[in-house]
């Protein structure tokens, strides 16, 4: 599975995203041809090689060739994309980004979604940036997007609504739920379009997931900041599936002062948030206190999200994590017919069949028979694949 990791060390904007995808292999002519599926005119595209702090990158610019361009409502943009000649996946990605952007604008201005009126983001260059991002991800075959945290930035920015603090209100709204860094200098580092791309598409935040790199693209922003190169780095890679070695993180903490009833809820929250496995084990701590060790196996991209759950849903005031590797066997999920009815099972590549607990539990409760008897029946009747 191809994945893209957005390393937003200096920030992200729509033009930086398209530029990085061009550097990764999206031809400018393909971008022009695909964008022709939109009923837009009065613009030209250009891309060039640039340098930021000694690092080579690519810039992308949309130049208006007609002065009068209309401002657009969200409903009009959504309809335009839906009725365009764009590919279905490109439409779906672009619609997701625009909807997140519209939801943020609606919340900031206190208006219904259908009444959201775009200014900067309704202009042609922003539409091209968002749809261009969707075209690039589709062209490169990207199936999943992951991202680092985003720099908050500071200062003020001039907008159609006047002088606003950095990040702009819509950007700040879009940043909710995304890890942020606050050690960067003056200036707008994340635009509303850039924040919407990450908020709509990223499946996880933090370090990149385990992958085999295929290429790296550097998309350059217009400004040249003094303290670091104004570049968005996008890593394109192939993520292993099925049997093989997988890089994971192990999160651990020791808890000796929590109501035992809370542990079950904590496990549920972690698993729902994407933890690969959660376990509790007893241990004896200093001063001979009985305690519980919480161990979480996680995808590296989920570190921030799962750490936040542990620290908010338990009495832990800290946790440690370290990298590990695991080997998984290829498997598939099936539904098998038995004398007790249909049962969900996992079938390993060796042919071994293992019953699914939830499915067996449901049968045991419905038929009023012991769970262990359900397991025995399924194992006897399903046996090998």
Swiss-Prot record:
<dbReference type="GO" id="GO:0016151">
    <property type="term" value="F:nickel cation binding"/>
</dbReference>
<comment type="similarity">
    <text>Belongs to the LarC family.</text>
</comment>
<dbReference type="GO" id="GO:0016829">
    <property type="term" value="F:lyase activity"/>
</dbReference>
<keyword id="KW-0533">Nickel</keyword>
<protein>
    <recommendedName>
        <fullName>Putative nickel insertion protein</fullName>
    </recommendedName>
</protein>
<dbReference type="InterPro" id="IPR002822">
    <property type="entry name" value="Ni_insertion"/>
</dbReference>
<dbReference type="Pfam" id="PF01969">
    <property type="entry name" value="Ni_insertion"/>
</dbReference>
């Amino acid at each position: 599975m191809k994945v893209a990791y957005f390393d937003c060390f200096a920030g992200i904007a729509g033009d930086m995203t398209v530029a990085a995808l061009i550097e990764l292999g999206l031809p400018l002519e393909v971008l022009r041809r695909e964008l022709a599926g939109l009923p837009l005119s009065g613009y030209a595209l250009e891309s060039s090689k640039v340098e930021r702090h000694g690092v080579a990158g690519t810039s992308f610019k949309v130049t208006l060739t007609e002065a009068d361009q209309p401002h657009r409502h969200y409903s009009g943009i959504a309809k335009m994309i839906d009725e365009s000649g764009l590919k279905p996946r490109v439409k779906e990605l672009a619609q997701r980004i625009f909807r997140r952007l519209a939801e943020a604008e609606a919340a900031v201005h206190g208006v219904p979604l259908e009444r959201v009126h775009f200014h900067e983001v309704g202009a042609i260059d922003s539409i091209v940036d968002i749809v261009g991002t969707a075209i690039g991800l589709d062209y490169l075959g990207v199936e999943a997007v992951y991202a680092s945290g985003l720099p908050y930035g500071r200062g003020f920015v001039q907008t159609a609504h006047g002088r606003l603090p950095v990040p702009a209100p819509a950007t700040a709204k879009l940043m909710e739920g995304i890890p942020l860094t606050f050690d960067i200098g003056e200036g707008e580092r994340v635009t509303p379009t850039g924040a919407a791309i990450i908020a709509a598409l990223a499946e996880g935040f933090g370090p990149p997931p385990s992958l085999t790199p295929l290429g790296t693209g550097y998309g350059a922003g217009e400004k040249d900041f003094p303290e670091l190169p104004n570049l968005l780095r996008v890593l394109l890679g192939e993520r292993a599936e099925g049997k093989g070695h997988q890089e994971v993180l192990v999160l651990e903490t020791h808890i000796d002062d929590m109501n035992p009833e809370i542990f079950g809820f904590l496990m549920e929250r972690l698993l729902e948030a994407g933890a690969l496995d959660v376990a509790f084990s007893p241990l004896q701590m200093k001063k001979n206190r009985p305690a519980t060790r919480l161990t979480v196996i996680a995808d590296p991209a989920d570190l921030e999200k799962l750490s936040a759950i542990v620290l908010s849903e338990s009495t832990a005031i800290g946790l440690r994590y370290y990298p590990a590797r695991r080997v998984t066997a290829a498997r598939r999920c099936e539904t098998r017919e038995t004398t007790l009815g249909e049962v969900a099972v996992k079938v390993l590549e060796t042919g071994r069949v293992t019953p699914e607990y939830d499915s067996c539990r449901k049968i045991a409760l419905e038929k009023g028979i012991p769970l262990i008897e359900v397991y025995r029946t399924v194992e006897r009747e399903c046996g090998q694949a």
